[in-house]
């Protein structure tokens, strides 16, 4: 809900967007272009949120990191000149019950490759304010790293 107070220029520079699937209790990493199209443009109202495919030049892509990717690998990334892995876009979903840390590989629309580390996942809940019960969306805390030669570039 913090998003609604952002300036239009700030909204347009968001490179990562998340979608929560209440049925499967999972958080999906999605392309910001896809989310803008689904939420703002009313063009794809009949499309299923998690099965739509975009092929646009500034399309952020994700893939789950291998199971053997560790915190040590993540910490070394900013000291490396390159992060060589074969990137294959795939659905990146994190169950809200997942053990943390967990990792997602990311490739920005400009081809920069890096890693997102999920540090914690807060499940959906409710809170009572003034005697009224309100839903609280799930949340994640995360950080990102890119190879050293990309660390000074703008991620967009």
List the model feature ranges, each with a label.
Residues 1-156:
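Surface-exposed, beta-sheet-biased, low-hydrophobicity segments with strongly acidic/polar composition
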